[in-house]
Amino acid sequence: MPAPSVVEAILRIDRAAFGDEWMMDQQTFREALHATQRARIFVSHDDGELTGFVIAGVTDSYGFIQRLAVHPDFQRHGVAGSLVQNSLSWIHSRGCRSTVVNTEVSNDAALSIYEKNGFVPLDYNLLVMERQLSV
């Protein structure tokens, strides 16, 4: 687990990148790190400031890009592509032959990054559903 100051910086970037609807909290962050047999966080910096991160994980044969976020001030500067490339190199070094990622169908920026890094859409229909609960 990274130092608390790094976790806070990662969560700040995540909030800035995703807003309230999809943002991670500390519990979700821990779950992402423990969702696979082994996970690693790659970060990017600019003048000592954390600008983006990716959480990558591996199982026996598959790699996963579990979370990718870049602060809006640093988007469209190659940060996300570099983070994806670093995570793919690490996943490959762990012996995985395939890597999976998911993103919103309407997220053109993410789709472009993943396609530039060799990802292709799979023929899956995934429906996200929600039920409001009274508090």
Please tell me what each predicted stretch does.
Residues 101-111, 128-133:
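Conserved beta-strand-loop-alpha-helix junction that forms the acyl-donor binding cleft
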Residues 1-10:
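A short beta-loop-alpha structural element at the N-terminal edge
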Residues 58, 71-73, 77, 105-106:
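Active-site acidic-Proline motif in GNAT/NAT acetyltransferases
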Residues 12-24:
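Helix-loop element at the rim of GNAT/NAT acetyltransferase active sites that forms part
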Residues 70, 76-89, 93, 112-116:
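Conserved acetyl-CoA-binding loop-helix of GNAT-fold acetyltransferases
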Residues 28-47, 51-69:
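A conserved beta-strand-loop-helix scaffold within acyl/acetyltransferase catalytic domains
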Residues 91-103, 125:
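Conserved GNAT acetyl-CoA-binding A-motif
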Residues 115-124:
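Conserved acetyl-CoA-binding loop of GNAT-fold acetyltransferases
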